[in-house]
Design a protein with these regions (language model features):
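Proteins that catalyze or organize thiol-disulfide redox chemistry
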Residues: 1-181
Length: 181
């Protein structure tokens, strides 16, 4: 056994991986942007609070399946205004939407919409099929060229929090190390 294996044995998981929480973005626009940057399909689970609570439980087993884990991003939304304006396709208010982001993560296309009560096997099959199609039809991005092209086209992404660090403790982001204001 390797040294890493011996160390890992001391830190075994306490619960079942199928019950692990499903990662969720703070808002759909950020999720769509990150999915585009990571070149992944994003799964939008939408509905009212009660529906979302139930969906989190059922989606967990699928999202943590060995064939699925790490291949998708997820977002849970109760307010349809956060996503209806930037998506094309079936915009039913509640359901599981499999979405392909555009090149710059500004918009997305709903490629399949399923009811929230979809059985795990059917959902898993739909996800794997969507991912297979996405991988075959999406050109790999070169980060530097992608950012350059986006800037030329005037596409900008503003994060809710400024980039940088407050090194001098004045409450403002220091733009460049070593430069005085």
């Amino acid at each position: 056994m390797s040294a890493f294996g011996e160390i890992a044995d001391d830190y075994r998981a306490k619960g079942k991986s199928e019950a692990a929480a499903v990662p969720d973005f703070p808002n759909f626009r950020l999720g769509l942007n990150v999915a585009s940057a990571d070149q992944r399909v994003i799964i939008l689970i939408s509905g009212n609070e009660k529906e979302i609570k139930e969906a989190r439980k059922s989606i967990s087993a699928v999202s943590n399946d060995p064939e699925i884990i790490g291949r998708f991003h997820y977002d849970f939304e109760t307010d349809p205004k956060t996503w209806t304006g930037i998506l094309t396709g079936n915009k039913s208010k509640s359901g599981i939407k499999i979405i392909v982001p555009d090149t710059y993560g500004q918009k997305g296309k709903i490629v399949e919409s399923l009811p929230l009560e979809t059985k795990a096997e059917k959902l898993k099959t739909a996800l794997l099929k969507a991912n297979e199609t996405f991988v075959k039809t999406t050109e790999k991005k070169n980060y530097q060229n992608h950012v350059q092209e986006g800037r030329r086209k005037g596409i900008k992404w503003t994060m809710p929090m400024e980039f940088g660090e407050d090194r001098d403790g004045d409450g403002k982001i220091d733009r460049r190390a070593g430069r005085r204001r």
